[in-house]
C-alpha cells in the first residue's frame, strides 16, 4: 500500500508510544499503547489510545480515552470522551465509522458500532 506524503511522526514532550505502530504524519502528545495509528493521526495531550486501531486523519482530543476499538478515517473523538472498555476475554470491540464526530465527554460502551453519526 502507499503512504501519502507526510512529514515524519512527531512525539511531543509528554507523548509516549509503547508496543505500537505509528504512520507518517502522526502527532503524539498523549499515550499510545498496543495500537496501530494510520497517517496523520493526532493524539492530544492527556489522551490515551490503548489496544486500538485508529485510521488516517483522525483526532483524539485532550483527555479522551480510546480502548479496544477500531476508529475509521476522519473521525474526531472529543475532549474527555470515552470510547470502548479495557480489553479482556469477554469485552466486545467498539467500531466507529468514517467521518464520525464524538462530542466532548460522550461515552461509547463496548460492542457498539456507529456509522456516519454525530454522537452527542
Residue ranges and their predicted role:
Residues 1-120:
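Left-handed beta-helix
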Amino acid at each position: 500500500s502507499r503512504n501519502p506524503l507526510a512529514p515524519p511522526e512527531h512525539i511531543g514532550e509528554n507523548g509516549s508510544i509503547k508496543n505500537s505502530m505509528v504512520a507518517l504524519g502522526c502527532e503524539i502528545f498523549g499515550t499510545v499503547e498496543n495500537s496501530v495509528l494510520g497517517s496523520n493521526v493526532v493524539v492530544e495531550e492527556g489522551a490515551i489510545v490503548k489496544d486500538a486501531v485508529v485510521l488516517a486523519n483522525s483526532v483524539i482530543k485532550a483527555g479522551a480515552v480510546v480502548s479496544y476499538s477500531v476508529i475509521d478515517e476522519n473521525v474526531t473523538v472529543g475532549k474527555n470522551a470515552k470510547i470502548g472498555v479495557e480489553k479482556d476475554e469477554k469485552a466486545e470491540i467498539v467500531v466507529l465509522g468514517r467521518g464520525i464526530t464524538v462530542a466532548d465527554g460522550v461515552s461509547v460502551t463496548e460492542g457498539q458500532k456507529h456509522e456516519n453519526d454525530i454522537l452527542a
